[in-house]
């Protein structure tokens, strides 16, 4: 699929932890083409911010045509994203990047903080024994329960 910018509708948005948000976007073509480890470029609706924010794809729901991103507020652009509501729209481009190789060997997934979201789609797609070691700065262990559905999870804080 050639990457192109599309205007996606926000299906839902939820605060997972302090400064961490989960957003589902209606983007059927991108969801169908997405692979574990890829990302999308997310544009703000504020035209003074020219550059998109690269955000990893957390999940791709190919059946319903949706992408899930989980992001941390790190500046003005992601702070703007956190104020969006269901039904709002934003421009996205993707899927971008090469993604992760999916080999049928034992997998050891390691990630911390905002590096954890792309591990969820990878764990769902790997057809092998999986252990995920995930780290957090504090007690807010977002996505840990979701990862437990697909891998043995070890938490480091």
Locations of regions flagged by a protein language model:
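Ferredoxin-reductase
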Residues: 2-86
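FNR/FR-type flavoprotein reductase catalytic core
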Residues: 76-157
């Amino acid at each position: 699929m050639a990457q192109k910018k599309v205007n996606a509708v926000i299906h839902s948005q939820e605060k997972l932890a302090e400064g961490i948000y989960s957003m589902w976007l209606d983007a059927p073509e991108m969801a169908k083409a997405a692979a574990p480890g890829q990302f999308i470029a997310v544009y703000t609706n504020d035209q003074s911010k020219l550059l998109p924010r690269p955000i990893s794809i957390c999940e791709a729901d190919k059946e319903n045509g949706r992408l899930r991103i989980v992001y941390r507020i790190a500046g003005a652009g992601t702070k703007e994203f956190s104020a969006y509501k269901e039904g709002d729209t934003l421009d996205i481009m993707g899927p971008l990047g090469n993604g992760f190789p999916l080999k049928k060997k034992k997998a050891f997934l390691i990630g911390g903080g905002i590096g954890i979201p792309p591990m969820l789609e990878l764990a769902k797609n790997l057809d092998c024994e999986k252990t995920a070691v995930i780290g957090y700065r504090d007690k807010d262990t977002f996505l840990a329960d979701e990862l437990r559905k697909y891998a043995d999870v070890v938490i480091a804080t």
